[in-house]
Every structure is written in C-alpha cells, then in structure tokens.
Amino acid sequence: MADNDFDNVTEECFTSTKSFWNFPCAHRQYRHEGNCHLIHGYSRSFHFVFGIKSFTKEGFAVDYGDLKELKAHLDHMYDHTLVLDEEDPHIDTFRKLENAGVCRIRTHPMGPGMEGTAHYLCEWTDNWLRKKTRGRAWVISVEARENDKNSSIYTNPNAGFKGWTG
C-alpha cells in the first residue's frame, strides 16, 4: 500500500468481484451414502467478492493484476487434483496412489464439497488479501461452483475493516 492510500479512504460501500473458471479436479464425499462417496470430478469455478476501506492510488478497489498469487493457489489446489476430507478413512490408500504418481491429493478440513471449499478459500484469501493490502481490502464472500447447477456461498463473518496493518 502506498503512503497516499490513507488519503483514499472511503466511507461508501464499494465492492469488487473476481471470478476464476475451469479448474478440473475430482473429489469424494466419504460420508455420503449415495454416489457422491465415489470419486467424481467437475470443472470448478470461484467467485470472490471483496470489500475495501480505501482505493489504491490508481483508484482501484482491488487491482486484478495483483491477484496472481491467488490464481497460483487455485491452480495448486484445484488443477488436476483430488480433493479429500482430511478425515477420509482411506486417506492412506490415496496417499499411496499419490506417491506412485497417480494423483495429487489436497485436503480440506471442512470436506471437499463446495461448502468446505468456499469456507477454505474465504479464510485463505481473506488472510492473504489483508496482509497484501495492509488491511485495506478483505473478502466478503466466496462462491464455489462445481457445475452450472450447483454452488455454495460462504459469507465471511469477519468481513470489514479491522485496522491498518504492517
């Protein structure tokens, strides 16, 4: 954040959004009694809503060019990966497959579905964005979409200005 960002403080409620599309990955819901306990895949997409306390010196709420690290994290987590619940009873079997080069495992503490994914991404991105902007910007919500019909939105209970940092 530039020194003059403190001069760009706004009392208005501005938000900014960014969407990322087409992350091919698989997951399984081991607790599900139906077909979702089987490994299946989707092309995931994500929609982020950001809030701000001030604009950048260029007048942006969030400079989309500064989101490369977020995109890299999404690639790491969801590009040709297998997302599992960290408590999946077969995690050791999946780790053996990963060690054999058959898959790349990623885990979520709240499960691999869209609800757990939206929650995970909201927390990760909010922490990252607040550090990157010295508290100027934060995440309001994240939508995780598994296809055209199904998504989950997690609304950040900690959204809002918490003070300038770093």
Report the location of each language-model feature.
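Charge-rich, low-complexity N-terminal segments
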Residues: 2-166
